[in-house]
Amino acid sequence: MIKFNPIKNKHPQGALKNNDNFYFEVFIKDDFYFNDFKIIIKNEYTGEHISKRLEFKEKSRENYSTYHVTFEPFNTGLYFYHFEVHFDSFYVYLKNDKLDGKLVNSKEELPDWQLTVYDKNFTTPDWYKGSIMYQIFPDRFKRSKKYTAKIAKNENVRIRHENWNSIPHSSITHENYGAKDFLMGNLLGIEEEKEYFKKLNIESIYLNPIVESPENHRYSTSDYFNVDPYFGTNEQFEKFCKDFKADNIRIILDGVFSHTGSDSIYFNRYNNYDSIGAYNSQNSPYYSWFNFINFPNEYHSWWGFDNLPTVIKENKEYSDFINNKDSGVVNFWQKLGIAGWRLDVADEFPDEFLDRIRESAKYYDKDALIIGEVWEDATNKISYNTRRRYFLGDQLDSVMNYPWKNAIINFVKNKNAEDFTLEVLKLVENYPRPALDAVMNLLGSHDTERVLTMLAFDNPEDVPVHERPTYKMSNEQYAKAKELLKYASFIQFTLPGVPCIYYGDEIGMYGFRDPYNRLGFTHNDKDEDLLNHYIELSNFRNENKDDFITNFEFIYTNNKCVAYRRNNVLCIINLDSKAHFIENYSGEKLFGNNEIYSTPFGTVVPPKCYVAIKIK
């Protein structure tokens, strides 16, 4: 009766700039009689509704007519829309059914479509687009013998592992577990592997926190202005950034600004610092940063972990401490040479705080990168009852792309091409182009099971917890997971955005959730076949870099096979046990695990194949 899909029938496609004119086209069957047909658009921030009639445009094929409606530019914001069809005495509604339009009797039956309108001046760093990123958990990458770790202020609670291959402590293996055991990875260890990163065509390294902290994850900040003494010194870090940038590799730091550590200059619960911390006195210069329920032992903390007292982000003194353009934490580390930030738990920050982080970071370096830890669609996220405006142009450049991580893994495991296509298109439609080109595409992180573990099991959570510390995959399990990872990484490297390799995934490391996804990098136990796959994949992406910036279009979705176009490159993933024919597209193979057969009319793709071709 009525055909509409915003991917095909909203122009321009995707999120709009606030200076874009735009229009919708709807195709209505000629024998579908109605009195009136309107689009209803709601401004999510103001509550204002806009109603406008669609007008007949022209007769089209197959007994359909085209109706359309045009709009002048909208203000920056988030909008939702649907269509209303008016008959003599009742209405029906055209609503969003997996992006396609579906007629329903009730407005509540299906969701509206989303329309994102962002600031026309919103830009993201060009140096980042088309590149490849690598994530390192600093304590677990490499321990250089050239650095001798200094004694820490809280040395008495820390545990140093002598054996690099030690299994990390956990609540399964140790009572009163507090993540205080260290493998002693350090800055010089990372720098010693620079040629390794160059071989993988890495252009940015995201480091989990490096500042002083008594815990190996270092999310419990003790001192915002100093590298942890186990990891290195500020002087070494400045040289580290400079040396890597000379080889076109930029450093991204983890910004942990939602909470501090209880064992810190600022809170000082255990008196390991010379400061008067908030825990020590209500006259402390830091007291107003924290929210005490019953001083000193009851206070708000992140998810109830008393080692992570939350800060009051609205507090001006704290906000200045982080964001002052001359003396703030953000500025301090950028002066030492970092190229940007990954903001931990971005949902915990009020909008005003995020605004200031962007202002501060871009003030020092207009090309600074700001990535947020957001686990959902960042354009419509609600946190603490507030609709967030991460991607309207004045906060984040990018987010960790967990929705596509899940979509990729589900696709290669379950082979449902339609579900995969839908999940990809949702973000293509909602994300501003500058953000889409910069989104951080991951398959795993320090907060998830490693990707090989995800691919080896239907559900890793089904594995008994007591088996996880020393779990070894069977050869059959590993071979299956590795083969699926090759498909998954090909997709990761060819979708819009920037692929990020979590350290060790490329050499066959696997593991369950924290801390077993954070083992020491196995320098002497690498899967060379898998590593070569990643090297060749990164070479392919790097050699065709311009094709992987902007422009994305699905060409084919059928059963267990998808094909999408990135400018002059066609990427095909066929998980089916039979061949598929991609009509109208042929060319030379650039990368893949199988040969294709090109004809004047299209390309025959063999079963169980991932391949990229240069379109003729």
Protein language model regions, located:
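C-terminal accessory region downstream of the catalytic core in glycan-modifying enzymes
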Residues: 520-531, 537-544, 580-600, 605-609
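Active-site-proximal helices and loops of the catalytic beta/alpha 8
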Residues: 241, 245-250, 258-259, 264-275, ...
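C-terminal beta-strand-rich structural cap/linker in extracellular carbohydrate-active enzymes
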Residues: 30, 568-569, 599-616
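Glycan-association/targeting regions that enable binding to alpha-glucans and other polysaccharides
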Residues: 1-130
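Substrate-binding/active-site clefts of carbohydrate-active enzymes
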Residues: 137-203, 210-335, 357-363
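Hydrophobic faces of well-ordered beta-strands that scaffold small-molecule active sites
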Residues: 132-134, 205-207, 251-253, 341, ...
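Carbohydrate-binding surface patches
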Residues: 554-585
